[in-house]
Amino acid sequence: MSTSHAAHPDRLLPADPATRDIARRLLTYVEDLPIISPHGHLEASMFVKDEPFADPTTLLISPDHYLTRVLHSAGVDLADLRVGGTEGKTPREAWRIFASNWDLYTGTATGYWVEQEFEHVFGINPDRLSAENADDIYDELSEILARPDFRPRALAEQFNLEILATTDDPLDDLADHKALAQDPTFSPRVLPTFRPDAYTKMYNPGWAEKTTRLIDVAGDGKAGWEGYLQAMRNRRQYFIDHGATSADHGTHDTDTTPLSHEDAQRILDKGLAGTATLAEMRAFEANTTYRFAEMCQDDGLVMTLHPGVYRNHSASAQKKFGNDIGADIPFQLEYTRGLRPLLSDFGENKDFHFVMFTIDETVFSREVAPLAGYYPAAYVGAPWWFIDEIDAMNRFRSLTTGTTGFSRYSGFIDDTRAYCSIPARHNTSRRVEANYLARLVAEHRISETRASEIIVDLIDASPRRVFKL
């Protein structure tokens, strides 16, 4: 029996004994429910290949930008953590760096998740993690990862993973998704998600080449803006045919102002020629966001929006290590005015599901919850990126529930590249919901019977309903 605090059955539950008892009872309704992950960043190929994980660093450290950014902020070179395929250190040396700096994670959500992974996935007491024990734990993990029951497919069964959505380029052939769907020996559903960002952001390197190829490959012989729209429609349908239920959009901001056909064509031509201004690039992206919502009215894909992040804030790090290394920084923006064109035209359609995410907690109560509290199409996305941590998740409930109730919630989103953190993240969400609902019961605001119904809906029914799973 582990003596680690990470194994305590009351972790994250209320400190007040009476309220904690209620939370314990509520947790029993959901703790063992299957995991539904409608948005994340794992690769379907991992399950097709089903190969043993190479080593602890490759699995747990290098791909997890939540984890590596903490070390980088303390002066650790990302190359020494083998980020972006770099090999500044061996996997064992990178692990030693992590273990030697384990104290940096105290109080962070990342530290909590890693502790939960150690305790509940690998059976290793996380209190042992230190510079002195780094090699011993590395060797223990290496032995565990060599076992057949720790290959990707076996872990999916162990995690009780029912649905996992990936994030995919519109021109992806989705062969791995098709192979998994046709494999009777693999029960989890691995679904693609349409992510067109590479073709909407003119300011990103390679945009013109990618967009030209998209139109050539999927535009049905049409050119220009018409070819662009036709290509997007065709690829969306291809994704739907391969199991997709949603399209994700990592927009710069919330602007959804539509352009006329003529203006869209003009800016597209300038973008392909490399002469578009930044204002025109932003206008093009806003127009595509509106047009994707328009397409949703026909094909039924759920539309999720992740705005307000300055991607690749460190240009030097991007050049050296690539994208998605943890160098994304939030900036302030508003939702009410930006989303008005989209929601004014499509928000009254209850069959259109539009999920709004934010990294700015103040927006939840000021704009996102009021929008979701009026428009039948609008839903409040779960806390994301920097605010999918325990205290912010508790605040999220207080900031939104008074306006929207519980029915306008997306369901929990783990949004992770770290495979073994999935059960830890979902268990965290379940405990946070039990914590919040127990308080409402203790304050005699709802009955415990009603709370038990709500928590099951939040964990299981909400993501199925909102993401049309």
Curated annotation (Swiss-Prot):
It catalyses: D-glucuronate = D-fructuronate; aldehydo-D-galacturonate = keto-D-tagaturonate. Keywords: Isomerase. GO terms for molecular function: glucuronate isomerase activity. The keyword Zinc-finger does not apply. The keyword Membrane does not apply. Belongs to the metallo-dependent hydrolases superfamily. Uronate isomerase family. This is Uronate isomerase. It comes from Corynebacterium efficiens (strain DSM 44549 / YS-314 / AJ 12310 / JCM 11189 / NBRC 100395). The gene is uxaC.
